Amino acid sequence: MANYFLNKRAVLFVWCAALSVYAYTEIPAAQNAPLPQEQTQTEMTAAVSQAQAPVQGILSITDCKALEEQYYRMQSFDPQLLLDSFDRIREALNTSFEDAGLLDLYFEHAKLISMLYVYEGNRQCGKYDTLIQGEAQDFLRQAEKLTGKRAGFTREQMSALFMRYANYLYTKIGVPKNTFAIASAVPVLYRKALMLNPGNIEAAVKLACWHIFPADVTTGNYNSYIESQEEYIEELSAADRFSAYLLYSIYYMKKYESAKGRAYLQKAVALFPNHVLLLRVYENYRKGIFSL
């Protein structure tokens, strides 16, 4: 367990350093980013998975989110159920690639597999992750070519798939050989998702969170966009809300609005009180450092 915490914190340190370097070099498009329309994550998930027949032995999106929450509570789980489910998804995709629901599940599984490999060094998941890296981007390109075509993918479905892929990549930002390429790709995927579906709340909030890294009291263009997305945080999944709470806490601390900063930190504590990131944020705040 001690090695787990040390390894994870080392990854997080590299991840944060890379983000800081990239964020300060990016020319923001925050002012022109579309604002989300009223559309909940539940509605978007339903749109992506419409007409999908249940496949026996495959974990649903809800099941995957439950495993992710369990992980965020620092409770381990046996990855074999996840890997077996992933095998069945890949088999199903070989016979029915034009099923947006299956691709959605593919990328949701991929994110969890990557988390277990990157953060814990699970070798079995590492073998699967190598497989995913070789085919995931091709899957996304094929789906993009089918977008808007008859019997293809809708814009809303493709928007959701861009976000699934971005979430998968996000788990790898702390890996040194991938850092810059992934840090460059993730915000582009957020914007692509918003272009296809301005109502994609997850994309809007995560793009706002991305802008928090370089934001401070002087960055009015970032700040207006960040604060315009704040009301949508509660629409996210539990794991995504936790990350947003921490980042918005940092944002308000950097703006010297400490009451709001502490309030968001307490929300994060209430959600996942044992998460390792909380220790890092507390330590940084004590030193007057407002970052992860």
Q: PLM features: residue spans?
A:
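Terminal, low-structured helical/coil segments at or just beyond the last alpha-helical repeat
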Residues: 242-250, 254-292
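Helix-turn-helix repeat elements of alpha-solenoid scaffolds
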Residues: 74-90, 125-145, 179-187, 218-228
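N-terminal leader/linker segments that initiate helical-solenoid repeat arrays
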Residues: 23-115, 119-123
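N-terminal secretory signal peptides that target proteins for export/translocation
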Residues: 1-6
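Bacterial N-terminal signal peptides
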Residues: 13-20
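Short coil turns that delineate tetratricopeptide repeat
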Residues: 97, 198, 237-239, 273
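Amphipathic alpha-helical repeat scaffolds of TPR domains
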Residues: 56-72, 98-123, 154-174, 199-215, ...
